[in-house]
Amino acid sequence: MGSCSPQLPLICLSDQTLKPGSSKWVKVRSDVRKALEDYGCFEAKIDQVSMELQGSVLKAMQELFALPTEAKQRNVCPKPFAGYFSHNGLSESFGIKDANILEKAHEFTQQLWPEGNKSIKMIQLYAEKLAELDMMVRRLILESYGIEYFIDEHLNSTYYRMRLMKYIARPDNDITAAVGANVDNGANDNADGDANVNDDGASIGVKVNVDVGDDVNDNDSVNIGVGVDINVETNVNGDLDAEANGDATAWVVGAVSGNASVGAKEANVDAELGLPSHTDKSLSGIIYQHQIDGLEVKTKEGKWIRVKPAPNTVIVIAGDALCALMNGRIPSPYHRVRVTERKKTRYAAALFSYPKEGYIIDSPKELVDEKHPRAFKPFDFVDLFNFYHTEAGRRAPSTLQAFCGVSAGK
């Protein structure tokens, strides 16, 4: 039965065997394009990051999150929502801009350890390897569409931001509500929630701890589905501490409540842990799950694929910015996190690429034709982000479509 479950495409991106211009490069290029067009993401088997480095990064993350709260709170940034976040002792996350650059990584270290800490080198090296992988993937994408001339300009117009995340292990008697795919983009990133379900299964109260990106604002409306095809309209009011340019940050939520008819079966299924479905705003992201799974991706057919962690594998996922750049050829997939493990702490790391401020995202003319008419107007990513924080942006089912879709009437 398990063999019939949908799975993401698995593509080998081994640095040792994949060389530009080789027959394998051409084959992988085609596979990457097909996977992204079909799913918006794929699982990649890599050798760029050794098991030893992965272990060192996990150890460094554990050391990082073990710091006293007052020390962690020194991870601040002039740019809004780019520092340390914690919510009710349930989750924590750090954001590091340009984590792949040693000097920038050291600046992050100085915030937490004025005397310095050598472990940051492992995180920087990890980010550097993932950045190299990301650039290779984006090169493969552009080549597959015959726009090689655009590669250098594109790669030089982006930067990286890393997010390090920790999900605190929950007790066995903790009841949680799964959050479905019908989520207002105002709360358009990963969230984990606790739910209290009445004996009659008719009423729930949800506290949402959101592991999100730069796209979340503090007074948002969220449609939370508890069970199958059941939505709950929930007003979220809280303090925001999400990164301005990172898709896997965190959000402090003040209060969330709602009512829904929840069957016992659905309540049991969703009592594991739910994180709202969302699309990333980035160009691309590379996600690594350390040992404990949780990531799920929604297919075009509406099925959820649960991605199991495996040695030397990562998830490559397209964001809204890439969707716009590629004129909608590559979708930005909905995905969520459901942590079902109990008494185990989950660590995850993600590296996201973003357009630099002032760079205009505009689909190359080769991607616009009769079969694929222009889907999005040119825009600056910063303007998209600012629109997201307006009333119209928060309410739109698709921030990208509402902001720059050719049918948006703007």
Curated annotation (Swiss-Prot):
Gene3D superfamilies xref list: B-lactam Antibiotic, Isopenicillin N Synthase, Chain
EC class of the enzyme, as a word: oxidoreductase
GO biological process per UniProt: glucosinolate biosynthetic process
Keyword terms of this UniProt record: Dioxygenase, Iron, Metal-binding, Oxidoreductase
Documented EC number(s): 1.14.11.-
InterPro entries found in the cross-reference section: DIOX_N (IPR026992), IPNS-like_FE2OG_OXY (IPR044861), IPNS-like_sf (IPR027443), Iron_ascorbate_oxido_reductase (IPR050231), Oxoglu/Fe-dep_dioxygenase_dom (IPR005123)
Function: 2-oxoglutarate-dependent dioxygenase involved in glucosinolates biosynthesis. Catalyzes the conversion of methylsulfinylalkyl glucosinolates to hydroxyalkyl glucosinolates.
Entry protein name: 2-oxoglutarate-dependent dioxygenase AOP3
Native organism: Arabidopsis thaliana (Mouse-ear cress)
Gene label: AOP3
